[in-house]
């Protein structure tokens, strides 16, 4: 589960006699007022249905299960893991992806990987890139992903006069190749647990 809003499966599992009912926190906040209210109501009730509590980070654990549960040692941290060899830097991938995207070898490439939704804060990415563009006119922004706010972000980029400097790749199955083509990775999310994307970018 990602938040206390998903309490129904936990209750049903307990009612069905499941001996091990596990809750896992993979985030550190919840989007929207309704979701926040549901979390506030359900979080105290969750302890009646759960045997084991897991979280991908301390912040995520404290957010879903509370400080007291964390301090009592009731929360087990299981950090997200990636194949570091797969995401390591590749000069070959850097060259090929830049050629594919029509980016020169010496241009500064700023990148981001994430769904176009409020949580990922693409508006901040645009503001930052706009400032970078003023100092580095040849800079390019590579945005990997899709989502309901994509057209809105494209419109904002157009108004800011940087749309022609941005590459929208859509969803990619070979993200690791694109990461090698980037010089700077932006990740200004409003909230996260321990995002795989950030781990991959640092590999």
Question: Locations of the language-model features?
Answer:
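Short His-centered aromatic/hydrophobic patch
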Residues: 1-6, 25
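Short glycine/serine-rich donor-binding loops of glycosyltransferases
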Residues: 10, 195-198
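A short, active-site helix/loop in glycosyltransferases that binds the activated sugar's phosphate group
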Residues: 50-88
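A short helix/loop element that forms part of the nucleotide-sugar donor recognition site in Leloir-type
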Residues: 88-103
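A conserved mid-protein helix/loop that constitutes part of the nucleotide-sugar donor-binding site
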Residues: 108-137, 148-154, 196
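Nucleotide-activated donor-binding/catalytic signature segment of Leloir-type glycosyltransferases, i.e.
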Residues: 154-170
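Aromatic "clamp/platform" in nucleotide-sugar-dependent glycosyltransferases that forms part
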Residues: 171, 190
